[in-house]
Amino acid sequence: MPQAYENAGVSVEAGYEVVKRIKSHVARTNRPGVVSGIGGFGGLFDLASLGYNEPVLISGTDGVGTKLVIAKLMDKHDTIGIDCVAMCVNDVVAQGAQPLFFLDYIACGKNDPAVLEQVVSGVADGCVQAGAALIGGETAEMPGMYDEDEYDLAGFTVGCVERSKIVDGSTIEAGDVLIGLPSTGVHSNGFSLVRKALFEQAGYTVHTRLPELDDRELGDVLLTPTKIYVKALMPLFEANLVRGVAHITGGGFIENVPRMLPEGLAASIELGSWPVPPIFDVIEKAGDVDHMEMYNIFNMGLGMVVAIRPDRVDEAMNLLEHAGEKAYRVGHVIEQVNERVDLA
């Protein structure tokens, strides 16, 4: 046993135990194109085997942010990996790409195999939902950088799309209909404000139960995994129905919807056209946050906004319903230069 490294606070044996525990979770994410298993210096993927004509790779990386604090307080680590995958693959699918593979990075103060297995099991769950293979990762034990019960989680994904089917919003026109796909709740953005409003200002704890949240523990509601939209959106891409997609993450509607719009166009969003999960009202009241500012911070119940030609909206809604996805007509595209998003 490498005693000197152990004395420095790094457990080599615990690292071996983590690898042993996660192998079965990694195996269930296997998909066509995967060449190598975990354990090599890099993960191998055979793009040629998938039959693309003009493949364009789209990459994305993200983390979970301070939602990890809620996981720590609840001592619940089996879904936070889904959040990590979702934050990455939802960005990639917003440009029309099918996620192919994923890699994770975990940094911790002390290597706890039981906790890290829970984290990676969630990553694997997210990969299965997204159709992406978990082909590699890194677990870094960093005593002195993190407390023993702390860890950080980030991920990286690569997806692929035919060049002719890239979704970049360039064909969006005034009159296009905006369809919203519901979120599961807060997802993984805004948790610094969430914690300040709920725990500091309102004095709640993760174990507080509120009637407006069906008496569920607040921490349980906040840990609801970020929704993965890959399987809902891919049929729309295959039918060439989508002109643009906005992933509603940090910055809410105000920052994210304009990212898909050409210059000179804006989004007119009809408030009340979709249900807003009650957790947002709880946060707004607890933190005394201006109602309209909430739309500049959170997803407010919509994780994706999709631009569709008016004459193809019914077709898109039918495909979404067939995929088991509830969708709402939430607005339309207008000609406007100054304000890029109208919320009314």
From Swiss-Prot:
Q: Which InterPro entries does the protein's record reference?
A: PurM-like_C_dom, PurM-like_C_sf, PurM-like_N, PurM-like_N_sf, PurM_cligase
Reaction(s) catalyzed by this protein? 2-formamido-N(1)-(5-O-phospho-beta-D-ribosyl)acetamidine + ATP = 5-amino-1-(5-phospho-beta-D-ribosyl)imidazole + ADP + phosphate + H(+)
Which terms does the record give in the GO molecular function aspect? ATP binding; phosphoribosylamine-glycine ligase activity; phosphoribosylformylglycinamidine cyclo-ligase activity
Q: What is its EC number?
A: 6.3.3.1
**Keyword Ligase attributed:** yes
Q: Where in the cell is it found?
A: Cytoplasm
Q: Does the keyword Ubl conjugation apply?
A: no
Q: What is its main location?
A: cytoplasm
Listed GO CC annotations: cytosol
Which keywords accompany this UniProt record?
Answer: ATP-binding, Cytoplasm, Ligase, Nucleotide-binding, Purine biosynthesis
Q: Which SUPFAM superfamilies match?
A: PurM C-terminal domain-like, PurM N-terminal domain-like
Q: In which pathway does it act?
A: Purine metabolism; IMP biosynthesis via de novo pathway; 5-amino-1-(5-phospho-D-ribosyl)imidazole from N(2)-formyl-N(1)-(5-phospho-D-ribosyl)glycinamide: step 2/2
Q: Which Pfam families match?
A: AIRS, AIRS_C
- Name the family the entry cites: Belongs to the AIR synthase family.
Give the PANTHER family listed for this entry.
TRIFUNCTIONAL PURINE BIOSYNTHETIC PROTEIN ADENOSINE-3, TRIFUNCTIONAL PURINE BIOSYNTHETIC PROTEIN ADENOSINE-3-RELATED
From the Swiss-Prot or TrEMBL record, give the protein name. Phosphoribosylformylglycinamidine cyclo-ligase
